[in-house]
């Protein structure tokens, strides 16, 4: 029996993140923001919700040792997501010269607050500076002490642990995170990375989990999602954050990696499963996406067209090599566009 690990791209996570191959996150962000924001397309995005999801993922699939290497749990006054984001931004840009928040120039603090639309009205300028200095100083200092580790509050850690414990014990999800010594034909692996090409363009992915049934020759791709909405409402998040791109891209890459392998070439990749949990309701649900082999655009319940990742990738590849100031649509129409979004009432 050959392990699926032998086909994986064996690099550490920093190497994976730094690689130039296009990922799901890049494609989905490009589709949301458009080609005029290419200059910031590859910038790392950090939000409290992403941090929480990463913490659950790490503790659940990599274990406590890996969690302790990446995160530090501290007790500090509760902050809103906006204040946390502002503090992280200030720390990222000023920590080398300012170990404390209080030494940063007020104008820079105000500028950072405006970036996150925090009391953006000009009449609140003094208040927003004062509020950030009073509320965020302790958290800023903790970020300095933490170094390369990510700071989690005690409350966040309690929620992380609750989610992990529930996922490991809930009848709907415990199978994914447990092993049966009598099922030697079942292989469960976490955080495997793969790399392939589409029409000469490098693409990459990292699976939260892959389950391989070596007897039935079936491969089950699985992803863990933490959500701010009730688990039953995941379909809205699925289309909003374009998880169809993730499922279809990852399936394509995995298929490319197994198709020429003598052992795995006859294995069949199954529908993509998303394990969804909310930190408040803590009632995990497994959502199944059967369109992961699809190659056509999709339409969501609101009528929005969800372009196939291949079309997005080709467009992104064009703009990454393009130095002009016009869109593809404008160029194709000689810079004459028709207003067509209005209809008679």
Model-predicted regions and their roles:
Residues 1-204:
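Metal-dependent nuclease catalytic cores that hydrolyze phosphodiester bonds in DNA/RNA
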Residues 56, 207, 250:
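Single, functionally critical "micro-switch" positions that shape active/binding sites
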Residues 60-65, 211, 226-229, 255-259:
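Hydrophobic/aromatic-lined pockets within catalytic cores
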Residues 68-69, 80, 230-231, 282-284:
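Short catalytic/ligand-binding loop motif for oxyanion handling, primarily in non-cytosolic enzymes
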Residues 98, 105, 239-244, 249-345:
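Metal-dependent nuclease catalytic regions and adjoining charged, substrate-binding loops involved
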Residues 165-175, 212-214, 251-261:
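Short regulatory "switch" loops immediately downstream of catalytic or recognition motifs
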Residues 181-183, 211-219, 255-268:
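Secondary-structure boundary elements
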Residues 192-244:
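Non-catalytic protein-protein interaction segments used by genome-maintenance enzymes to assemble
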């Amino acid at each position: 029996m050959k392990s699926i690990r032998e086909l994986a791209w064996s690099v550490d996570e920093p190497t994976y993140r730094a690689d130039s191959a296009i990922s799901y996150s890049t494609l989905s962000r490009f589709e949301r923001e458009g080609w005029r924001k290419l200059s910031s397309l590859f910038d790392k995005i950090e939000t409290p919700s992403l941090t929480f999801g990463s913490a659950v993922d790490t503790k659940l699939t990599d274990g406590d040792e890996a969690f302790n290497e990446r995160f530090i749990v501290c007790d500090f006054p509760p902050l809103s997501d906006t204040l946390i984001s502002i503090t992280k931004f200030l720390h990222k840009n000023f920590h080398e010269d300012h170990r404390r928040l209080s030494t940063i120039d007020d104008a820079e603090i105000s500028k950072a607050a405006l970036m996150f639309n925090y009391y953006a009205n000009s009449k609140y300028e003094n208040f927003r500076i004062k509020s950030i200095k009073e509320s965020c100083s302790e958290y800023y200092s903790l970020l300095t002490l933490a170094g390369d580790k990510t700071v989690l509050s005690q409350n966040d850690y309690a929620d992380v642990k609750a989610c992990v414990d529930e996922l490991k014990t809930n009848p709907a999800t415990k199978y994914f995170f447990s092993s049966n010594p009598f099922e030697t034909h079942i292989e469960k692996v976490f955080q495997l990375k793969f790399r392939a090409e589409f029409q000469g363009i490098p693409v990459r992915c990292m699976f939260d989990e892959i389950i391989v049934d070596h007897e039935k020759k079936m491969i089950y791709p699985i992803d863990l999602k933490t959500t701010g909405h009730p688990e039953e409402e995941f379909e809205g998040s699925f289309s909003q954050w374009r998880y169809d791109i993730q499922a279809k891209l990852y399936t394509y890459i995995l298929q490319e990696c197994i198709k020429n392998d003598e052992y795995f070439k006859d294995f069949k990749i199954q529908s993509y499963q998303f394990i969804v949990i909310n930190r408040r309701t803590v009632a995990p649900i497994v959502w199944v996406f059967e369109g992961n082999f699809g190659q056509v655009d999709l339409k969501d319940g609101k009528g929005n067209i969800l372009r196939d990742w291949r079309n997005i990738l080709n467009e992104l590849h064009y703009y990454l090599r393009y130095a002009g100031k016009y869109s593809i649509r404008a160029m194709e129409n000689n810079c004459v566009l028709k207003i067509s979004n209005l209809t008679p009432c």
